[in-house]
């Protein structure tokens, strides 16, 4: 068994942003293997550019290819970073679909599969403080910053 891939919050958000805007995992893998970022250009937005995506990952020893194929754990989540990662990854709107405050995310309703992805990806400085099964088979989650 191999260790779980660790990704910075920066790389995780860029990866999920690409997926959110329709870039397939195969296209992401091709970009990683060839260095040709053209396929990622459709996901570029004001704060999400891919110019440094591969060089940042290489410089920080991130295994992007394995992260795409096997999943990953974020090394550290900031409040805003976690809020943005949740919004992009699960196509949710902060303040509407979930609440995010200092050291707290609540009212987050996910499918079982989404909850599992969150559980596997969430940085260790956060934890799932509460999980309630909803009547329609979803999970309502409360996340807290450790130590708060």
Language-model segments: which ranges?
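Structural boundary micro-motifs
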Residues: 1-148
């Amino acid at each position: 068994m191999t260790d779980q891939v660790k990704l910075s919050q920066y790389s995780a958000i860029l990866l999920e942003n690409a997926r959110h805007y329709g870039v397939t995992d195969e296209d992401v893998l091709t970009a990683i293997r060839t260095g040709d970022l053209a396929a990622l250009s459709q996901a570029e937005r004001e704060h999400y550019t891919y110019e440094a995506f591969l060089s940042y990952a290489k410089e920080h020893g991130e295994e992007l290819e394995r992260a795409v194929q096997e999943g990953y754990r974020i090394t550290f989540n900031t409040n805003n970073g976690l809020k943005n990662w949740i919004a992009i990854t699960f196509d949710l709107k902060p303040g509407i679909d979930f609440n995010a405050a200092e050291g707290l995310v609540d009212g987050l309703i996910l499918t079982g599969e989404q909850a599992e992805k969150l559980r596997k990806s969430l940085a260790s400085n956060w934890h799932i403080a509460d999980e309630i099964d909803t009547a329609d088979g979803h999970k309502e989650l409360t996340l807290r910053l450790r130590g708060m």
